[in-house]
């Protein structure tokens, strides 16, 4: 694949972040801010974006952490993850991104080529 044929919706090719520990506070705060931004931007009230916004709340992420993470074991992300998401589900890429981030990883996601409004709203919210 030619690098010039890649269209970045969020982020840049040269910028991959360092690995973090799972459920890093910076990611939890980012997701909580994303939740608030999605609520504001989702003017058409897409139900799948409302569900994503609810999922990203700090309280929900803390519940996930408490139920699935042992803080006594030192863990770090593996590095860079590459996701290929289904083309018929406009918000699936966001959940894939969220779990990659919560695992402490940088993420590269191939999103559907369909022009979903929900995808645009989510990417815009991430940038804000």
What do the predicted segments below correspond to?
Residues 1-78:
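N-terminal Rossmann-like NAD(P)+-binding subdomain of aldehyde/semialdehyde dehydrogenases
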Residues 67-127:
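Conserved small-residue-rich beta-alpha loop and adjacent elements
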């Amino acid at each position: 694949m030619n690098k010039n044929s890649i269209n970045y919706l969020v982020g840049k090719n040269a910028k991959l972040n360092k690995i973090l520990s799972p459920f890093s506070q910076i990611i939890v705060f980012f997701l909580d801010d994303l939740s608030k931004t999605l609520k504001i931007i989702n003017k058409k009230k897409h139900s799948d974006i409302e569900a994503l916004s609810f999922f990203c709340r700090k309280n929900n992420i803390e519940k996930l952490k408490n139920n699935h993470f042992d803080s006594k074991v030192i863990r770090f992300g593996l590095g860079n993850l590459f996701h290929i998401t289904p083309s018929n589900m406009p918000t699936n890429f966001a959940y894939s991104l969220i779990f990659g981030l919560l695992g402490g990883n940088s993420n590269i996601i191939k999103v559907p080529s369909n022009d979903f409004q929900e995808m645009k709203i989510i990417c815009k919210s991430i940038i804000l």
